[in-house]
Amino acid sequence: MLVSLSWLKEFVDIDEDAKTIAEGLTMSGSKVEGIKSYGEEISNVVVGQIVSLEKHPNADKLWVGIVDIGSEKLQIVTGAENIKVGAYIPVALHGATLPGGVKIKRSKLRGVESEGMMCSAEELGLDESLLPEYQRNGIFILPPLPLGMDINEALQLKDDVLEFEITPNRPDCLSVVGIARETAATFRKSFRMPEIRVTEVEEPNPARVTIEAPDLCYRYVARVVKNVKIGPSPIWMQVRLLKAGIRPINNVVDVTNYVMLELGQPLHAFDLDKVKNKHIIVRRARDGEKLVTLDGKERILDSSMLVIADEEKAIGLAGVMGGENTEITDSTVNILIESANFKGSNIRHTSKKLGLRSEASARFEKGLDPEITVLACERAAQLMEKYCGGEVLKGIVDEYPKPMERTVLTVRPDRINKFLGTNLATSEMIEILRSLEFEVVEKGEELEIKVPHFRKDVTMEADIAEEIARLYGYNNIEDSLMKNAQTTLGSLTKEQQLEEKAREVLLACGLNEIVTMSFMGERDLDRINVPKDSVLRKAVKIINPLGEEQSLMRTTLLPFMLNVAYTNYSRKVGEFRAFEISRVFLPKELPLKELPEEVKTISLGMYGKEVDFYTIKGVIEELLEVMGIVDVEYVRAEEPSYHPGRSAKILFKEEVLGVFGEVHPDVLENYDLPVRVYAGELNLDKIIKFANVDKKYTPLPKYPAVERDIAVVVDKDLFVAEVEKVIKETGRGFVEKTALFDVYKGPNIPEGKKSVAFSIWYRSYEKTLTDEEVNEVHARIVKALEEKLGAKLR
């Protein structure tokens, strides 16, 4: 954001120089990245008028001009092709200096004396690329101005321009008024808005506005100005636009851009005579609808986009760019000024989808204040009346379906001081907040604060503390020791150590760690088959999202793992094994009244020739074993994201530690993954809660173990864990451990059945077991499997 210091000083009385202002604003949170000075190095350059122009006698590409500078007439030789007799131009006299230390002297060019130099815009320090075609690569053509007037005075050129880095949460600072408000608060000066007075004629405003998409258009204001005369805008306005990096076009368009820079509200001007029945309709685009935008390109739209239309056609892409079919041209007589407020995330989505960004979309997508729309419209009407010769028709159309309510917060000054480590008086806090246009009322030991409409980023007590801190000055807050706070020196907490141990186990199992963003969209949940009434749908919404696909804080890691799996598969990676340790955000209630629960979660994902259900189960078992969590139970999972017969929940002490299994084929189809993918999500917080990593000495067994194999035929849908559970329960006191070594379906196995084979180790810690004792226990296990699970010994 480029802000002219002379423009800034119209709204705040401040005498400090640019450097002091830049330092103060940077310290209060409005970071200044650079300062560019205009006119400082320019001297002895005046306004002149060409009174005659002849070909150079000795050069085909040079001209000899006589230029009147008021006090005298000078002969100047030039090679410019864009000049003519009668043109007003900047003239650098003998002894003049220009930006970059260039000095001008009398000289002879091919035998003809030149007593000065005609100047281009670039030679005056302006960006020539922003000028109209006829002004580029030639002399800067001026409007009629007093001859001999100093060019700095004529163009209001002498100025400093501050370049600000504006963060996305402060769209109110994308304006001169916004920066002026911050300047006034920072330097304890008075702030004033521009004076706006509109003189209306008796003729009523004929425009009508219908908002058909109130979820995307929060407010739409329209004014009509008739009998405008299209021409160049005042030179001072053009120069201000150039300093701000905006191309001057004509007086009407320049006024809309000027007001956008001044107040932060994008405007658009339609040729009213091209709007069918003077009826503006704000609606969603139709799928396949076409619109040629002002850049001359045809855009194919869809129903996710918002358009401004009349009764026949789309005439503008809401918040992004107007349509060519209602463009302001030299023949335009009557105009309609649009000042509207649109949903920021929708504007960002449209802009990104069409690959079309503009100064307007850059502001709208951050979320603007709907309360500024009328003021901006009136300001534009005022300037058009003055500089376009227009007549403002009576009445303003203002469609505002659901007026915005101001946020009201209750804060306690003592908590603010505790939070900041300061000892500020309540009166000082109130003074700071009021300088930022917060309304503050003392109520006992509390402050009731009404947040200004333009400060959507202030939603809680911590935000108020930040406002006070930055205006008080972070550099003024004295260092202090923390009181009553637990600290750890030189080591990780138990939770951090266990998280690191989990990471080491997963890396040792051959998985690669990934890191993904914490934001998701509704589409991510749709793609993994999350039901509409699922708790996972109750996600925290981002106030100023980067787009619809990043509008929520994520409640699951699965979509991100599948995205990474797809990226690897699409790049011909044949074997994929990965994990992520991150947080999911689960709100306790919506709308949000307190911070959501942040659950640390492990996400697993893998595919490949050697990968199956038991591969991912083995990784999980290894992790739990290292964490000292034994005797977990695996039960069938009924999760819509997973294959119903090839997924499981992990239970320990009646709590769910996680879910894993083969990803549902429908979900894989949504991600264009033609291979089987196995995934899982584990609650790391619960794993850490139950972890028991204290090492205990266990003597080596004195007596030998006896190993026996058992293979049984069971229903194909029966979980192997259920077979293992029966074996261990029946053989308690004798069965030391079990290991699955085969699952078989095929010839010699009945339809709907499968063969499951285990190795069983029998051991007593009191004596050596005899064959008879082992046979007896083994037989009991076979019988229990038959009775409880319907198993048949192979």
Swiss-Prot record:
Binds 2 magnesium ions per tetramer. Its EC number is 6.1.1.20. Residues 39-152 form the tRNA-binding domain. It catalyses: tRNA(Phe) + L-phenylalanine + ATP = L-phenylalanyl-tRNA(Phe) + AMP + diphosphate + H(+). Belongs to the phenylalanyl-tRNA synthetase beta subunit family. Type 1 subfamily. Its cofactor is Mg(2+). This is Phenylalanine--tRNA ligase beta subunit. Residues 404-479 form the B5 domain. CDD domains: PheRS_beta_core, tRNA_bind_bactPheRS. The gene is pheT. InterPro entries: aa-tRNA-synth_II/BPL/LPL, B3/B4_tRNA-bd, DNA-bd_dom_put_sf, Fdx_antiC-bd, Fdx_antiC-bd_sf, NA-bd_OB-fold, Phe-tRNA-ligase_IIc_bsu, Phe-tRNA-ligase_IIc_bsu_bact. Gene3D superfamilies: 3.30.56.10, Bira Bifunctional Protein, Domain 2 (3.30.930.10), Ferrodoxin-fold anticodon-binding domain (3.30.70.380), Nucleic acid-binding proteins (2.40.50.140), Phenylalanyl-trna Synthetase, Chain B, domain 3 (3.50.40.10). It is found in: Cytoplasm. Keywords: Aminoacyl-tRNA synthetase, ATP-binding, Cytoplasm, Ligase, Magnesium, Metal-binding, Nucleotide-binding, Protein biosynthesis, RNA-binding, tRNA-binding. PROSITE patterns: B5, FDX_ACB, TRBD. It comes from the Bacteria. The keyword Magnesium applies. Residues 701-794 form the FDX-ACB domain. One of its GO terms (cellular component) is phenylalanine-tRNA ligase complex. The keyword RNA-binding applies.
